[in-house]
Amino acid sequence: MARKKNTKRKVKKNVPLGIAHIHTTFNNTIVTITDLNGNAVTWSSAGALGFKGSRKSTPFAAQLAAEAVAKAAMEHGMVKVETFITGPGPGREAAIRSLQAAGLEITAIKDVTAVPHNGCRPPKPPRG
C-alpha cells in the first residue's frame, strides 16, 4: 500500500488586528501582513505578481501587491492594520493608499527606515 503523504494544510486564522510591513527598495516592493506577534499571515511582492525588471519598481506594481495582500488578509478576518514602512522606494504612498482602498482600516503609519550613523558608503549615483 502507498503511504499517505504528510502535507500541511493552510490554516485559516481569525486575526482581526494586524501589522502591515511595506518594504520598498529602488527595485521592488514587498508587502507582508503579520499578526500582532509578528507571525506572517500573508505576503506579496511586485516580483511575485509577475512584474519583471524595471516594472517591479513602479508605484502601480506596489499598488497591486498591496491589493493582493489586503484581499488575502481580509479572508483571514482582518479589519484593522498598523502600517510600518521601510525603505526609499517609489511604491510607498501607492501601497498605503491601496491598502486603504481595499477596505482595511489603517490605524497608524510609522516610517521605520533604518538611518545609518554614517555606516556603509552608499552606492554611486547612475550617470546618464
Curated annotation (Swiss-Prot):
GO terms for biological process: translation. SUPFAM superfamilies: Translational machinery components (SSF53137). One of its GO terms (molecular function) is structural constituent of ribosome. The keyword Translocase does not apply. One of its GO terms (cellular component) is ribosome. The keyword Ribonucleoprotein applies. Keywords: Ribonucleoprotein, Ribosomal protein, RNA-binding, rRNA-binding. Pfam families: Ribosomal_S11. Located on the platform of the 30S subunit, it bridges several disparate RNA helices of the 16S rRNA. Forms part of the Shine-Dalgarno cleft in the 70S ribosome. Belongs to the universal ribosomal protein uS11 family. Part of the 30S ribosomal subunit. Interacts with proteins S7 and S18. Binds to IF-3. This is Small ribosomal subunit protein uS11.
